[in-house]
A protein has these predicted regions:
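Phosphate/pyrophosphate-binding betaalpha-module
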Residues: 1-70
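Functionally critical mobile loop/hinge segments
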Residues: 39, 44-146
């Protein structure tokens, strides 16, 4: 139980840093801020569960954010269903892959704080149509299956 609690605290700490330095809101930073942040939090938690050093958890979080960089928030019909569900599934795979990289001893070449700051810069540069407005990206596609 203590190990799980520690992993949850690790995830919360990563999420707190991202929320402070950037955003965890799709309306502010696109899906990179939502799914990317969640993926980074999960990657760090997996490293904590594996008993890895703290730097591995930080590296895993940075790997996950780098892989999510630029992901837009474009909910079809304004509902958190399509493409959101699929992106969350991809976020799980991303988190596990990022954790595997860090757990195998691969160090992230970029500073995690810098990656978070880059995510904010990218989110700030996104047009409003790609930040949870339901106007651009997949939200602008025709719905084929009801």
């Amino acid at each position: 139980d203590d190990q799980l609690v520690d992993a949850l605290f690790t995830a919360a700490a990563v999420g707190g840093v991202i929320a402070t330095r950037a955003s965890i809101s799709g309306a502010e930073g696109g899906c990179q801020a939502e799914c990317g942040s969640a993926s980074a939090m999960a990657a760090a938690a997996v490293c904590e569960l594996a008993g890895a050093p703290a730097q591995a958890a930080v590296d895993a979080a940075a790997f996950a954010l780098m892989a999510s960089m630029g992901l837009v928030c474009d909910p079809v019909r304004g509902l958190v269903e399509v493409p959101c569900v699929y992106r969350n599934v991809s976020g799980v795979a991303n988190a596990l892959t990022a954790a595997d990289l860090a757990l195998s001893g691969i160090a992230c070449p970029l500073d995690a704080d810098d990656v978070i700051d880059a995510m904010k810069t990218v989110g700030d540069a996104m047009p409003a149509s790609l930040r949870e407005t339901g106007e651009g990206g997949c939200a602008a596609c025709r719905v084929r299956i009801e």
